[in-house]
Amino acid sequence: MPTFLHHALLACGFLTRLVPARVATADDMAAAVRWFPLAGLVVGGACWLPFALGLAASHPAIQAWLYVLINLWVTRGLHWDGVADLADAWGSSATGERFWDILKDSRIGAFGVMGLLLGFGGQYIGAHEIFISGRLGVLIAAPIVGRGACVILAALVPPGSRSTLGRLTCAGADRIAIGVAATCGMLALLLTTPAITTVTTIAICGAIVTALAHLARREDGINGDFMGACIAGCEGTVLLAASMG
C-alpha cells in the first residue's frame, strides 16, 4: 500500500469509525496529521448524505437532532469527551498538576455537563437553521474546518510530555500540514458560505484556537482533550455562523 494512502486511512480510522483502526508507529501517527482535513471530509460526507437523500425532509427540527446523533455515531463521540473534560478542568480554576488530574479524570462534573449542553445546543441550533435554509453543503464544511483548526492548534503549542497523542500531533503539525489544513478549511467555507460569513467564521475559530493554545502553554502541555474541544468548538462555530449569514 502506498505510504500516503496508509497515512490517510490512519487519520480516518483514528478520527472516525467508518475506517477500521490500523496499527501504526509514532512516525506514522505524526505523518497522518496532514490528513486530518480528509477525515473531516469523510465525517461531513457521512453526516450530509442521509439528508441529501431526503431523510426527514420538511422536518428541520428532527433533521437537526438526527444530525447531532449521526455526527456522534460517526466520530464515536471522541471530541465531546474532550469538551467535557476540558470544561471541568478549566471551569475549576485549577492549575498545574491539579488541572491535569481533573482533565484526566473519567468522571464528569458540573462544568463538563454545562460544556456539553452548550456545545450540543449550539450544534443543534446551527444545524436546524441550516436545514431551514437548505444549504446542506455547510454540513460538509464544518467537520473539515474543525479538524483543520485542530492541526493549527497543535502547531502553536510545544509538544510537552503530558500526552503521547499530544506530542505526536504537535510533531505532525509541520508547515505542510498547516498549509493543507488552512487551504482545505478556507476552500470549504468559501464554497458553502458567503465571503463575510467565511471571514467571521475564521475570526471566531481563530479566537478559539488562540484561547486553547494559551491555556495549553499555561499548563505546559496539550492532549487529546484540547484537540477534541478545538474540533467541536470550531465545527459548531461554522454551523452557527453559517446559520446567521
UniProtKB/Swiss-Prot annotation:
Its principal location? membrane
Give TM regions: 35-55, 108-128, 137-157, 176-196, 197-217
Catalyses which reaction(s): alpha-ribazole + adenosylcob(III)inamide-GDP = adenosylcob(III)alamin + GMP + H(+); alpha-ribazole 5'-phosphate + adenosylcob(III)inamide-GDP = adenosylcob(III)alamin 5'-phosphate + GMP + H(+)
**What is the official name of this protein in its record?**
Adenosylcobinamide-GDP ribazoletransferase
Please state which protein family the record places this protein in.
Belongs to the CobS family.
HAMAP family to which the protein is assigned, alphabetical? CobS
EC number(s) on record?
2.7.8.26
Superkingdom of the source? Bacteria
Q: What Pfam families has UniProt attached to this entry?
A: CobS
Q: Does the keyword Nucleotide-binding apply?
A: no
Source organism of the structure: Nitratidesulfovibrio vulgaris (strain ATCC 29579 / DSM 644 / CCUG 34227 / NCIMB 8303 / VKM B-1760 / Hildenborough)
Q: Where in the cell is it found?
A: Cell inner membrane
Could you confirm whether the keyword Transport appears in this record?
no
Q: In which pathway does it act?
A: Cofactor biosynthesis; adenosylcobalamin biosynthesis; adenosylcobalamin from cob(II)yrinate a,c-diamide: step 7/7
One MF term in the entry's GO annotations: adenosylcobinamide-GDP ribazoletransferase activity
Function per UniProt? Joins adenosylcobinamide-GDP and alpha-ribazole to generate adenosylcobalamin (Ado-cobalamin). Also synthesizes adenosylcobalamin 5'-phosphate from adenosylcobinamide-GDP and alpha-ribazole 5'-phosphate.
